[in-house]
């Protein structure tokens, strides 16, 4: 949620010369705007669409996949990611997320039109147990996008992970 996953993912994919997949964009292309899906069909249906997009990306050529912040809350998504992908958590503190959301023009269905620190902390706390089991955690609080990209690329190299 507003950690910069899509921006980082695009730049990392470019740096590594691999394909980039944005799960939210894939869902929007297939099913329409995220907020419309949430309001008309509910979060559970959105998570199913998200899972389908994740599977489609995993079945395509190797690359970097940017997930929505809540993707790992859907058990099937988490299972397939654990089995078939390396998971990187870009950790940004709730206060920084709030600042980014306030500057953004995108309404996040689980946050609403007026983001609050308490709501962000609530989601963050609920999701943290799943985030913390990532293969790699980047403490991105005071890092530029380029620094985060470099740190992930270095980790991939160090682990001898080829995409």
Each language-model region and where it sits:
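Walker A/P-loop
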Residues: 6
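NTP-dependent small-molecule kinase module
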Residues: 11, 15, 125-163
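ATP-dependent small-molecule kinase phosphotransfer cores
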Residues: 22-71, 76-82, 109
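Post-Walker A helix-loop "phosphate-sensing" segment adjacent to the P-loop in P-loop NTPases
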Residues: 14-23
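Short glycine-rich anion-binding loops that position phosphate/pyrophosphate groups of nucleotides
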Residues: 69-72, 93-95, 143
């Amino acid at each position: 949620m507003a950690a910069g996953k899509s921006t980082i993912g695009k730049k990392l994919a470019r740096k590594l010369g691999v394909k980039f997949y944005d799960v939210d964009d894939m869902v929007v292309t297939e099913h329409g705007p995220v907020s419309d899906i949430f309001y008309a069909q509910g979060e559970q249906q959105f998570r199913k669409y998200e899972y389908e997009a994740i599977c489609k990306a995993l079945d395509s050529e190797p690359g970097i996949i940017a997930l929505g912040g809540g993707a790992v809350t859907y058990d099937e998504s988490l299972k397939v990611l654990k089995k078939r992908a390396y998971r990187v958590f870009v950790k940004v503190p709730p206060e920084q997320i709030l600042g980014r959301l306030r500057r953004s023009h995108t309404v996040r269905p689980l946050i609403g039109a007026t983001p609050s620190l308490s709501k962000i902390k609530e989601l963050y706390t609920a999701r943290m147990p799943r985030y913390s089991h990532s293969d790699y955690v980047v403490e991105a609080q005071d890092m530029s996008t380029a620094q985060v990209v470099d740190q992930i690329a270095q980790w991939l190299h160090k682990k001898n992970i080829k995409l």
